[in-house]
UniProtKB/Swiss-Prot annotation:
It comes from the Viruses. It is a single-pass membrane protein. The chain crosses the membrane at residues 16-36. It comes from African swine fever virus (isolate Warthog/Namibia/Wart80/1980). The lineage of its organism: Viruses, Varidnaviria, Bamfordvirae, Nucleocytoviricota, Pokkesviricetes. Keywords: Host membrane, Late protein, Membrane, Transmembrane, Transmembrane helix. It is found in: Host membrane. Its main location: host cell. This is Uncharacterized protein F165R.
Amino acid sequence: MANPNKRIMNKKSKQASISSILNFFFFYIMEYFVAVDNETSLGVFTSIEQCEETMKQYPGLHYVVFKYTCPADAENTDVVYLIPSLTLHTPMFVDHCPNRTKQARHVLKKINLVFEEESIENWKVSVNTVFPHVHNRLSAPKLSIDEANEAVEKFLIQAGRLMSL
């Protein structure tokens, strides 16, 4: 005869599994709609400190886009990386032109070191809100310095409003 305690444990275990799966999908779907609703360019930063300060106000869905210009490549100089704001040292996404794997790996190594270096002259840092589970091709926004500053100001104003709620 089966142990009744074991049956109860199995039932509770199944209920817990189903509950965790439902929770996962609920937050996954919510995250999707929040991200799609807020999919906007938030500006370009000239220093890691400025970027980090802003990112602290918006943890979660926001990704940092590091746009590196390689002087050796005159035709197409951009190699783009997305890194989650909560784990800035872990590269998660690479978007580069075909046949540029070596260049991409070189930049990937540089990203891992960028927080230890004071000089980031060749880097432009911008912030996008994106849906983190969709690994489609994304690129850094093309903004002028004035547009970038305006976008950052708007972003900081919005962040201030949200923080005061």
